[in-house]
């Protein structure tokens, strides 16, 4: 207590006459020069330096009119070098140190491990062109088809895009898909060839593919190497000259679009926003058009490349905000929502939102230990805040306990989510094989979409009440060298595909379009395609409606009792193959018991595959004399009766690890 009083007395004195202390003993007052006074810690000095840098940055941004803003993104096929090119642009504008080569905008651990972009990330850059400062907003988008929703949301914040093509691989399936998405949004496209320094690069072939596939003027295409930085300095002047400035007026009422959101333990929900009109500052009260809820803004800022606070965000800017008190419920942050200031709700037209992506692949997720369900629930809720395309429903299984039915856009989307649960949240989980939704059309006209095999109608109900069963189809676009054409067609036909078109867009490259059941696509079709073409094929797909199909529910029975967690909806042609796989694999992981265990795969009442696990058998004849036939027969009959009673009342004990091993690939 005495020490605290001494410190308070010391703080209350004027800086020039504070005592020079040693430990807690106070000496006589001495005159201290202000020039040699030091801050309490080095942290204070660092924060002061940071605030000076932020104010310098703000001052430059404040002097730039909206006519010198440019919002653009980079779109391409997966692994064509988008994130590496983003790094070079950030180096060029001084946002990061040269040579860091860290893929700064890939912020998730799973992105760095897999070398793919999963979440669209934004960064603000300042660039001086012809003696004038320009404010550039770069958005690095994913390339994989499963993250198409991320790409389309990014386009809403952009005026143009760099269409990036690998000079060694040329135009590929997702290049085509991303081009049409950007074209439909009316974006100005700048063709860019990457990896021109590779020995295998063929720029002329790639440019010809871009001309023939997209009808783009490639005379002014920029040939770069994101890895070495070759010609990267030509990109930003081209962006400034060709991509239009955003339209908006900072003097109008605030109109702000919610583009993305993520969760912070300390700040609550953080929102990534694009300001279309007006301006927003800390302390403003805003209202959501979607929910009607009102919030006070706690902080606004830009990504530079990390969160950098600013005093204001103006029309045309892309930045982040969070509220104080924070938005704590993830459901309040609706992607595509419009915000305005309180009092202007009737004067402002809400912006058109985004089309909600539909989940097309479903899995069940259970904690490895039933006691960890709450931890799994918290982890899932935090991750879906950052990815709204995932649907979540609670469900329960007799075998595996409480869990979730999760819906995803595709199998890679599911795999990435599983990795994030394990690595970022330490969750230990069981994931069932992916299934796709099916439609049940009843005779009375009612239509039901079934995403959980447990809700699929049984055989009797189908015969009595159901008019038709339908499964989803996709239009798959495959590109590959023509030498593999026969193998790819064979693979597509084996997966119940319907051929639509076959085109050569170069003398050796083929674009093949097939209509395929989505259920076949999620069963490692891409892996088989890569195997058939030695890794040279690329795949993109889009929804193609629903078709009538002969689909059934395949169940696993253990001693004639169904194991609910392992049921699947499949086409009838797959029943026998899958059934044999199931019973053989499940037998490997179930321990022997004191009674016989019968493992069956069945469709309705029809058993399609069976395996038997023999019981332990005690040698009851070990102590008998060889000639004692009647006693021998009596003991064997007694053992046989005991086994019958066990079979009637015995419950099969299946260890949790058996399900874990069975569900693992």
Curated annotation (Swiss-Prot):
Coiled coil: none annotated. The keyword Nucleotide-binding applies. Its main location: mitochondrion. CDD domains: EF4_II, LepA, lepA_C. It comes from the Eukaryota. InterPro entries: EF-4, EFG_III/V, EFG_V-like, EFTu-like_2, G_TR_CS, LepA_C_sf, LepA_CTD, LepA_IV. It is an enzyme of class 3 (hydrolase). It catalyses: GTP + H2O = GDP + phosphate + H(+). One of its GO terms (molecular function) is mitochondrial ribosome binding. Its EC number is 3.6.5.-. Keywords: GTP-binding, Hydrolase, Membrane, Mitochondrion, Mitochondrion inner membrane, Nucleotide-binding, Protein biosynthesis, Transit peptide. It is found in: Mitochondrion inner membrane. Residues 67-247 form the tr-type G domain. GTP binds at residues 76-83, 140-144, 194-197. It holds the Pfam family GTP_EFTU_D2. PANTHER family: TRANSLATION FACTOR GUF1, MITOCHONDRIAL (PTHR43512:SF7), TRANSLATION FACTOR GUF1-RELATED (PTHR43512). Belongs to the TRAFAC class translation factor GTPase superfamily. Classic translation factor GTPase family. LepA subfamily. Promotes mitochondrial protein synthesis. May act as a fidelity factor of the translation reaction, by catalyzing a one-codon backward translocation of tRNAs on improperly translocated ribosomes. Binds to mitochondrial ribosomes in a GTP-dependent manner. This is Translation factor guf1, mitochondrial. It comes from Talaromyces stipitatus (strain ATCC 10500 / CBS 375.48 / QM 6759 / NRRL 1006) (Penicillium stipitatum). The lineage of its organism: Eukaryota, Fungi, Dikarya, Ascomycota, Pezizomycotina.
């Amino acid at each position: 207590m005495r020490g605290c009083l001494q410190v308070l007395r010391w703080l209350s004195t004027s800086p020039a006459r504070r005592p020079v202390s040693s430990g807690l003993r106070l000496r006589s007052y001495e005159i201290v020069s202000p020039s040699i006074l030091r801050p309490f810690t080095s942290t204070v000095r660092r924060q002061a330096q940071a605030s000076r840098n932020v104010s310098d940055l703000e001052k430059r941004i404040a002097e730039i009119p909206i006519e010198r803003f440019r919002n653009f993104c980079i779109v391409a096929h997966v692994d064509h070098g988008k994130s590496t090119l983003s790094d070079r642009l950030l180096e060029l504008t001084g946002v990061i140190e040269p040579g860091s080569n860290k893929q700064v905008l890939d912020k998730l651990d799973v992105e760095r491990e897999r070398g793919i972009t999963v979440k669209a990330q934004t960064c603000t850059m300042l660039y001086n062109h012809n003696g004038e400062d320009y404010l550039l907003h770069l958005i690095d988008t994913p390339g994989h088809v499963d993250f198409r929703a991320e790409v389309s949301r990014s386009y809403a914040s952009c005026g143009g895009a760099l269409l990036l093509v690998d000079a060694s691989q040329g135009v590929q399936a997702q290049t085509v898909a991303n081009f049409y998405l950007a074209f439909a949004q009316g974006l100005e496209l700048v063709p860019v060839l990457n990896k021109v320094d590779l020995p295998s690069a063929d720029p002329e072939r790639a440019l010809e593919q871009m001309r023939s596939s997209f009808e783009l003027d490639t005379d002014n295409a920029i040939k770069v190497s994101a890895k070495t930085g070759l010609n990267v300095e030509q990109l930003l002047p081209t962006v400034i000259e060709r991509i239009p400035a955003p339209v908006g007026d900072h003097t109008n009422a605030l109109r702000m679009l919610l583009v993305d959101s993520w969760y912070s333990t300390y700040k609550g929900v953080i929102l990534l926003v694009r300001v279309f009109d007006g301006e927003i500052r800390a302390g403003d009260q805003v209202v959501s058009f979607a929910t009607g809820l009102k919030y006070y803004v706690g902080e606004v800022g830009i990504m530079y490349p990390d969160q950098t606070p600013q005093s204001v965000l103006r029309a045309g800017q892309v930045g982040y905000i969070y509220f104080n008190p924070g938005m704590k419920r993830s459901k309040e942050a609706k992607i595509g929502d419009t915000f305005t200031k309180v009092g202007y709700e009737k004067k402002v037209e809400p912006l058109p939102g985004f089309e909600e992506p539909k989940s097309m692949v479903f899995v069940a997720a259970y904690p490895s230990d039933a006691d960890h369900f709450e931890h799994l629930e918290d982890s899932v809720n935090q991750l879906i805040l950052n990815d709204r395309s995932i649907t979540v429903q609670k469900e329960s299984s007799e075998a595996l306990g409480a869990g979730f039915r999760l819906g995803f856009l595709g199998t890679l989307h599911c795999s990435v989510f599983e990795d994030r649960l394990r690595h970022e949240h330490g969750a230990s989980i069981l994931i069932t094989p992916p299934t796709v939704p099916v439609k049940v059309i009843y005779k009375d006209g009612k239509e039901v979409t079934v995403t959980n095999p447990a809700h699929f109608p049984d055989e009797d109900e189908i015969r009595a009440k159901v008019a038709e069963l339908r499964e989803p189809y996709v239009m798959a676009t495959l590109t590959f060298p023509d030498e593999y054409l026969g193998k790819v067609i064979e693979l597509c036909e084996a997966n119940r595909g319907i051929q639509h078109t076959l085109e050569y867009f170069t003398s050796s490259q083929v674009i093949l379009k097939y209509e395929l059941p989505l259920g076949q696509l999620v069963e490692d079709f891409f892996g088989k395609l890569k195997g058939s073409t030695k890794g040279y094929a690329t795949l993109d797909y889009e929804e193609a409606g629903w078709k009538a199909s002969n689909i059934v529910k395949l169940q696993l029975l253990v001693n004639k009792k169904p194991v609910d967690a392992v049921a699947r909806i499949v086409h009838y042609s797959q029943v026998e193959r899958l059934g044999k796989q199931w019973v053989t694999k499940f037998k490997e992981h179930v321990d022997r018991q004191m009674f016989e265990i019968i493992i069956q795969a069945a469709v309705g009442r029809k058993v399609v595959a069976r395996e038997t696990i023999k019981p332990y058998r005690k040698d009851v004849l070990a102590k008998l004399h060889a000639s004692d036939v009647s006693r021998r027969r009596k003991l064997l009959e007694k053992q046989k009766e005991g086994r019958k009673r066990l079979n009637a009342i015995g419950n099969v004990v299946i260890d949790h690890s058996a399900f874990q091993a069975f569900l693992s690939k």
